[in-house]
C-alpha cells in the first residue's frame, strides 16, 4: 500500500514539474500573438509569410504573417 502511494505521489510531482516547465514557452507565444487579431493555419515551408499575407488580405485584414509557426492576421 505504501509503495502505491509513493508511486502516485511521484507521478503527480513529475506531472506538476512537467507542466510548470512549459509555462515560459506558452507565455511567450501568447504575448507575441496577442498583437495580432486572429491566428489560424500553421506555417510551413510551402505556406510561408507571402501566402499567409495573401490569405489575410483575401479575408479583409490589413496585414499578416507567420508568428510562432502560425499565420496571424491584423486589422
Swiss-Prot record:
A Pfam match: Defensin
Keyword Disulfide bond in annotation: yes
Signal peptide: 1-23
Cysteine-cysteine disulfides: 39-73, 43-66, 52-71, 56-72
GO BP annotations listed: defense response to fungus; killing of cells of another organism
Localization, UniProt: Secreted
Keywords, in A-Z order: Antimicrobial, Disulfide bond, Fungicide, Plant defense, Secreted, Signal
Gene Ontology cellular component annotations, sorted alphabetically: extracellular region
The keyword NADP is assigned to this record: no
Family in the record: Belongs to the DEFL family.
Protein's name according to its UniProt entry: Defensin-like protein 58
Species of the source: Arabidopsis thaliana
Amino acid at each position: 500500500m505504501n509503495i502505491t502511494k509513493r508511486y502516485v505521489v511521484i507521478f503527480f510531482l513529475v506531472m506538476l514539474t512537467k507542466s510548470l516547465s512549459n509555462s515560459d514557452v506558452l507565455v511567450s507565444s501568447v504575448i507575441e500573438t496577442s498583437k495580432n487579431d486572429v491566428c489560424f493555419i500553421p506555417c510551413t515551408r510551402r505556406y510561408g509569410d507571402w501566402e499567409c499575407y495573401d490569405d489575410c488580405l483575401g479575408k479583409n485584414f490589413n496585414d499578416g504573417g507567420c508568428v510562432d509557426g502560425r499565420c496571424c492576421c491584423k486589422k
